[in-house]
Curated annotation (Swiss-Prot):
Coiled coil: none annotated. One of its GO terms (molecular function) is cysteine-type endopeptidase inhibitor activity. This is Cystatin WCPI-3. It comes from Wisteria floribunda (Japanese wisteria). A motif (Secondary area of contact) lies at residues 35-38.
Amino acid sequence: YGNTGGYTPVPDIDDIHVVEIANYAVTEYNKKSGVVAGVNYRFVLK
């Protein structure tokens, strides 16, 4: 099943569960990120 040890594209990025997981990931990432040595980091989902 799938690609062992690799990444595979999400078949439907508009699926409500995918959107919920992505929103959760971004929210958690934003809680842990911030300004470090004057640099802002951004998490991008395409």
